[in-house]
Amino acid sequence: MSRSIHKGPFIDVSLLTRIEALNTSGKKEVIKTWSRASTIIPDMIGHTIAVYNGKQHFPVFVSDQMVGHKLGEFVPTRTFRTHVKGDRKARR
């Protein structure tokens, strides 16, 4: 179920304050965050946000196409590992 419109998008308070502080100062810094559930808003465009995937922080450069999506959508948490080709032959 989607979020109610009258509540507005979810954005972590500490992330929002850091974005607003960078917008007023005009600096460009990488912002570390663990909040994968935060929605990308237009104020974040042009900033690089390092999103945690459970192991390390991955930098995500926010563009205008990303507005409305969640930060966690752009950083995968699982890596797909295929079986070694030699293992397939050994099983035959």
Swiss-Prot record:
InterPro entries per record: Ribosomal_uS19, Ribosomal_uS19_bac-type, Ribosomal_uS19_CS, Ribosomal_uS19_SF
Domain of life: Eukaryota
Gene Ontology CC annotations of this record: chloroplast; mitochondrial small ribosomal subunit
Keyword Ribonucleoprotein among UniProt keywords: yes
Protein localization: Plastid, Chloroplast
GO molecular function, one term: structural constituent of ribosome
UniProt GO BP: ribosomal small subunit assembly; translation
A matching Pfam family: Ribosomal_S19
Family: Belongs to the universal ribosomal protein uS19 family.
Job of this protein: Protein S19 forms a complex with S13 that binds strongly to the 16S ribosomal RNA.
Protein's recorded name: Small ribosomal subunit protein uS19c
Gene, per the UniProt record: rps19
